[in-house]
From Swiss-Prot:
Belongs to the universal ribosomal protein uL22 family. This is Large ribosomal subunit protein uL22. NCBIfam families: rplV_bact. The gene is rplV. Coiled coil: none annotated. It comes from Janthinobacterium sp. (strain Marseille) (Minibacterium massiliensis). This protein binds specifically to 23S rRNA; its binding is stimulated by other ribosomal proteins, e.g. L4, L17, and L20. It is important during the early stages of 50S assembly. It makes multiple contacts with different domains of the 23S rRNA in the assembled 50S subunit and ribosome. The globular domain of the protein is located near the polypeptide exit tunnel on the outside of the subunit, while an extended beta-hairpin is found that lines the wall of the exit tunnel in the center of the 70S ribosome.
Amino acid sequence: MMETKATLRGVRLSAQKGRLVADQIRGKKVDQALNILQFSPKKGAAIIKRVLESAIANAEHNDGADIDELKVTTIYVEKGSVLKRFTARAKGRGDRISKQSCHIYVTVGN
């Protein structure tokens, strides 16, 4: 059994929102997964679609895989670094804003 990976690190998307999309395509055939991502309104869907397309291209180019046979064997989204920012509030105060990032890992195989 052959498996091919693709990763995207440091994406400006929270891991929680990325996991919502990743859970929808885990275990599906790649053409079905691409179709789900194509019509999903979520921001994470477009990002994960790019990573999945990269994994498919890697499988085709590096391993000579047949695209029709490929499935999303594993997909997971991990928490990345957090950018801490401040926004001005009333009476000279400031509130912290944390800008989340994540790492996306996709593996396709037979």
